[in-house]
């Protein structure tokens, strides 16, 4: 199968490596210099250093060539950041693409839209579209370590296409039609990972970490169901699975934000050290606003947003959460 991946960051590169042994894969990146160096060195030294790119993997900075590679029956995967999704979708408007599947997570900063809403707004409703999400660190995928993801789409044929293309020896793909649930799970877990990083950075113990992750799952579910997702989706890979990985994994950028905040660092310093803004930072403001508009109780999200944007100290965040009134666990 012909597969084009738009976005040569760590995740796009890792997925391209995983698929190149059994498909004709082209990885497109916007920066011609980065792609030329990757072609010459057979290594993406900027975004995924230390991993040799398969000889069978094609690299390009030519957008038209990358889209042409998909053909009429291939698969188009978008591995940009959420901030890059709308500009890329607009760039796709002149082309006849057979489908589109995105890997980004979050809510758009200005509009508070989910990825599927952005794609539909720009490209319309006729193109088969879906979200590929779940617990996945790029470095582990590049190593060929086991991984499981979920493809969410309201188009059954696209779900089958993605499963047949991406499912492989070290990667299992499950399918669902709950696009909203999968996208909300992938977005809100980043906020909770910041909170978990704060808990760990303050050395409050594993009991506190477990409590926060568990109550965080309740919070994700409450929010996601209010937006139209299904409860069971949040018990799966894009909910509980992604939440556990992002909150506990040492490779988690969002957890690193929380650790830095607990150490007294300013957000600007943390972002500089990371090299880019972690999605949870962008997402916290959007989710706080959406929850307030809809009257959804989001105590952990609100506490994280207060630390990020309102000047609250990390210990104040913890104190505020512990001071909440007792309640039924499922409330």
Swiss-Prot record:
Keywords: Cytoplasm, Lipid biosynthesis, Lipid metabolism, NAD, NADP, Nucleotide-binding, Oxidoreductase, Phospholipid biosynthesis, Phospholipid metabolism. The keyword Lipid metabolism applies. It catalyses: sn-glycerol 3-phosphate + NAD(+) = dihydroxyacetone phosphate + NADH + H(+); sn-glycerol 3-phosphate + NADP(+) = dihydroxyacetone phosphate + NADPH + H(+). GO terms for cellular component: cytosol. NADPH binds at residues 11, 30, 105, 138, 253, 277, 279. It comes from the Bacteria. Pathway: Membrane lipid metabolism; glycerophospholipid metabolism. Belongs to the NAD-dependent glycerol-3-phosphate dehydrogenase family. Catalyzes the reduction of the glycolytic intermediate dihydroxyacetone phosphate (DHAP) to sn-glycerol 3-phosphate (G3P), the key precursor for phospholipid synthesis. This is Glycerol-3-phosphate dehydrogenase [NAD(P)+]. It comes from Herminiimonas arsenicoxydans. The lineage of its organism: Bacteria, Pseudomonadati, Pseudomonadota, Betaproteobacteria, Burkholderiales.
């Amino acid at each position: 199968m012909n597969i084009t991946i738009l976005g040569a960051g760590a995740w796009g590169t890792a997925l391209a490596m995983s698929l190149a042994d059994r498909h004709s894969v082209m990885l497109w990146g916007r920066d011609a210099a980065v792609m030329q160096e990757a072609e010459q060195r057979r290594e993406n030294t900027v975004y995924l250093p230390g991993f040799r790119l398969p000889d069978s993997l094609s690299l390009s900075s030519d957008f038209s060539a990358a889209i042409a590679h998909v053909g009429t029956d291939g698969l188009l995967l978008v591995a940009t950041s959420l901030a890059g999704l709308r500009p890329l979708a607009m760039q796709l408007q002149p082309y006849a693409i057979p489908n589109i599947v995105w890997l980004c997570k979050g809510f758009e900063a200005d509009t508070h839209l989910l990825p599927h809403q952005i794609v539909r707004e720009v490209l319309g409703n006729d193109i088969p579209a879906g979200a590929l999400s779940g617990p996945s660190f790029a470095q582990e995928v590049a190593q060929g370590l086991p991984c499981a993801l979920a493809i969410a789409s309201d188009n059954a044929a696209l779900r089958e296409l993605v499963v047949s293309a991406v499912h492989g020896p070290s990667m299992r793909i499950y399918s669902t039609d709950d696009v909203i649930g999968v996208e909300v799970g992938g977005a809100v877990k980043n906020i909770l990972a910041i909170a978990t990083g704060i808990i760990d950075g303050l050395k409050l113990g594993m009991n506190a970490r477990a409590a926060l992750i568990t109550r965080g799952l309740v919070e994700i579910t409450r929010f996601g169901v209010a937006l139209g997702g299904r409860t069971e989706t949040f018990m799966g890979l894009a909910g509980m699975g992604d939440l556990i990985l992002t909150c506990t994994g040492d490779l988690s950028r969002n957890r690193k934000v929380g650790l830095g905040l607990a150490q007294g660092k300013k957000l600007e310093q943390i972002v500089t050290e990371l090299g880019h803004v972690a999605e949870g930072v962008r997402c916290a403001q959007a989710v706080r606003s959406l929850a307030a508009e809809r009257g959804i109780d989001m105590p952990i999200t609100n506490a994280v947003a207060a630390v990020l944007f309102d000047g609250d100290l990390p210990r104040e965040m913890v104190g505020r959460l512990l001071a909440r009134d007792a309640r039924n666990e499922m409330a």
